[in-house]
Curated annotation (Swiss-Prot):
One of its GO terms (biological process) is positive regulation of circadian sleep/wake cycle, sleep. PANTHER family: PROTEIN CUEBALL, VITELLOGENIN RECEPTOR-LIKE PROTEIN-RELATED-RELATED. Glycans are attached at residues 82, 108, 175, 190, 313, 473, 508. It is a single-pass type I membrane protein. The gene is cue. GO terms for cellular component: plasma membrane. This is Protein cueball. Pfam families: Ldl_recept_b.
Length: 644
């Protein structure tokens, strides 16, 4: 009987150890990001792959916060009848998540933002309906108390964030008529407005303990939004990015990037923490996660390319977001946070002692648990996790962060517990993976690296090559001078080209391909009679001839003499005198009483000019009796009668 019981004890120890050492499927032992959707909480790793989901029994999740000391997530459900704020923790035996009510519902609350103080174990949240900020301890059924009341002044609290090290609470006032970013001590004293200008509708806010800065989202007028930053006292304000077609709610900050949730695109976006004043560009989305696939329309891109990345596509509307920052590992040496971190760790250690069981079986399990954390890691029985010392990571602290991190250099841990590489001479890059000689020397040149780090690498060129990178072929350059040397023997030739010219002369230059150097084309004979020059010349000559012809014609017209006026006088008489045998009608003038004179100007024969000869008086008499053709006949006939 004793043997059977002892065997069962050993079997039970083995089974429990196996359960503790083997993570169950769907349990986020190593999650880095947690995002609240409308009906669930989604856990993702550092590459934004979904590893688990939880809180499926809720209908309208919104804000959330994370207690890194005890691995607890606190979240809000807007439609739950009994509770307002809940906690989510892992069940070690069932290998799943258990949600418990933390803050009971007292009315029609509408939680906008959540924050947690791990030292005093208090929750802080903003109520957008009552326009107040409340706080309450997570243990016990204490009625929530009001920390800040903005209802009298018309304010609307939205995002909240706790500065654990300096014991202050920051919040955003999203009232469009008077928006602000404010802070107050956790005991309710010394309320201060730190931002009240150039701001439209601030939403989520977060305190970055690593850089001692504030980051918040500003929902600008129209379709624009921005992410801004400042020091904890409101100074050194910077615009990290400005974009459009997003509806961001909450944000989280890591060592080098900012992440925020967007309800419009149902996605999580990221951007470097370095300020970029220019308008950014929305990048194309990555492939959707197999766990949550949905159809979406990518936002309209803007003008410029910028490091704005869509890191995760979600199946539902994205709301709250938290990130694992390594608070207790990164800030152990920070002069503002060292004492707070020490106190929190002491409290956690004290709580862990309550979970120790004094039985022999439990002591054996305790040995297995302690052996789970390697490299000096501290085991947390309540959460079944290892808190690793600086320089190690992994679920059991089994991975050295500097292992194979630097390719050509020495790895050391920085003050913020991140690996940093010190490169060997001739190598550069974040991990010393880039050679300074890579692609530098051409045409077989050899790269030389000086021992002086400030001196640039140089190239040792082979024969017949030169230049800073051995890019100049002296044979090809000298061949140009050799070609000109045949025509001008006295021409100057650079040093070293004479021997090459002799070699080319012996080979008749048949085995050398002479290149075309535009900067040396001045040495060649220029081509004068090109097609464009000929066309321009012909057009110029023709135009000149036409211009001369026009000028000559104009001069001739200007100086041409006028045609003389023809004036003729005809003498008409009734009857010729017969007193002289030699008198004729043309030689004998008629008597004054028997003759008349007709003066015709500018007239001539009808066959020669256009002006006919006629008697104006006779025309007046016969104008009404005959036509124009008959008048001409009469005039000519009368003229013949008078002349002959």
């Amino acid at each position: 009987m004793i043997r059977i019981r002892f065997g069962m004890d050993v079997l039970l120890v083995v089974l429990l150890a196996t359960c503790l050492l083997t993570p169950a499927h769907g349990t986020p032992l190593e999650w880095d990001f947690a995002v609240t959707l409308r009906t669930k909480i989604q856990f993702m790793d550092s590459s934004w792959q979904t590893i688990a989901t939880a809180a499926h029994e809720f209908d309208e999740l919104s804000a959330l916060t994370f207690d890194e000391s005890e691995e607890l997530i606190y979240f809000n459900d807007l439609k739950h009848r009994n509770g307002s704020i809940f906690s989510l923790k892992r069940d070690l035996i069932a290998a799943n998540h258990v949600a418990e009510q933390t803050i009971a519902r007292t009315g029609n609350e509408s939680v906008g933002g959540l924050a947690y103080d791990p030292l005093n174990m208090n929750l802080f949240w903003s109520d957008t309906e009552q326009r107040k900020i409340f706080f309450a301890p997570i243990h016990g059924s204490v009625t929530p108390k009001v920390l800040v009341d903005l209802s009298a002044e018309g304010g609307r609290p939205d995002g909240v964030a706790v500065d654990v090290c300096r014991r202050k609470l920051y919040w955003t006032n999203s009232n469009v008529t008077h928006p602000t970013v404010e802070r107050i001590n956790l005991d309710g004293s010394n309320r201060t407005v730190i931002i009240n200008s150039d701001i439209d509708m601030p939403r989520g806010i977060v305190v970055d303990q690593l850089s001692d800065r504030l980051f918040w989202i500003d929902d600008l007028k129209g379709v624009f939004f921005s992410v801004e930053s400042c020091k904890l006292d409101g100074s050194d304000r910077q615009v990290v990015l400005k974009d459009k077609h997003h509806e961001p709610l909450n944000l989280a900050v890591t060592n080098d990037a900012i992440y925020w949730t967007d309800r419009t695109t149902r996605a999580v976006w990221s951007h470097p923490k370095v300020p970029v004043i220019k308008v950014t560009t929305t990048s194309k989305p990555e492939e959707e996660d197999s766990t949550d696939s949905t159809d979406f329309k990518d936002p309209e891109p803007v003008a410029e390319d910028c490091p704005l990345v869509r890191v995760a596509n979600l199946s539902e509307e994205a709301r709250g977001i938290v990130v694992r920052t390594g608070f207790y590992q990164r800030l152990q040496k920070d002069h503002h946070c060292a004492s707070i971190v020490r106190k929190v760790k002491e409290r956690v250690v004290e709580q862990n002692r309550k979970f120790e069981i004094r039985s022999m079986l439990d002591q054996k399990i305790k040995v297995l648990e302690d052996e789970r954390c390697m490299n000096g890691g501290e085991y947390r029985a309540a959460t079944d996790l290892c808190i690793c010392p600086t320089g190690f990571k992994g679920s059991r602290c089994e991975i050295r962060e500097c292992h194979n991190y630097c390719v050509h250099g020495t790895c050391q841990m920085s003050e913020l517990a991140y690996p940093k590489c010190y490169c060997q001479p001739g190598f550069t890059g974040e991990r010393c993976e880039l050679s300074v000689c890579s692609g530098l020397c051409l045409n077989g040149g050899h790269c030389r690296v000086s021992k002086d780090e400030n001196e640039a690498p140089s190239c040792e060129c082979p024969a017949k090559f030169g230049g800073a990178r051995c890019e100049q072929n002296s044979t090809e350059i000298c061949s140009l001078f050799c070609r000109l040397l045949k025509h001008e023997p006295e021409m100057y030739v650079p040093f070293g080209c004479h021997s090459i010219c002799e070699e080319l002369a012996q080979d008749n230059s048949t085995n050398i391909a002479v290149p075309q150097y535009e900067h040396l084309e001045v040495c060649l004979t220029p081509r004068v009679w090109t097609s464009s020059v000929i066309i321009i010349l012909v057009v110029g000559i023709v135009s000149s001839l036409l211009l001369v012809a026009v000028i000559v014609h104009g001069i001739r017209r200007l100086y041409k003499p006028k045609r003389p006026r023809i004036r003729k006088t005809f003498v008409v008489r009734k009857q010729a005198r017969t007193n002289s045998a030699g008198d004729t009608p043309l030689t004998n003038r008629p008597l004054a009483t028997e003759q008349c004179e007709i003066t015709i100007e500018n007239c001539c024969n009808m066959n020669i000019c256009e002006t006919p000869c006629f008697d104006p008086k006779l025309v007046e008499q016969t104008l009404s009796k005959s036509s124009c053709k008959e008048d001409k006949k009469i005039l000519i006939h009368n003229m013949e009668d008078d002349l002959y």
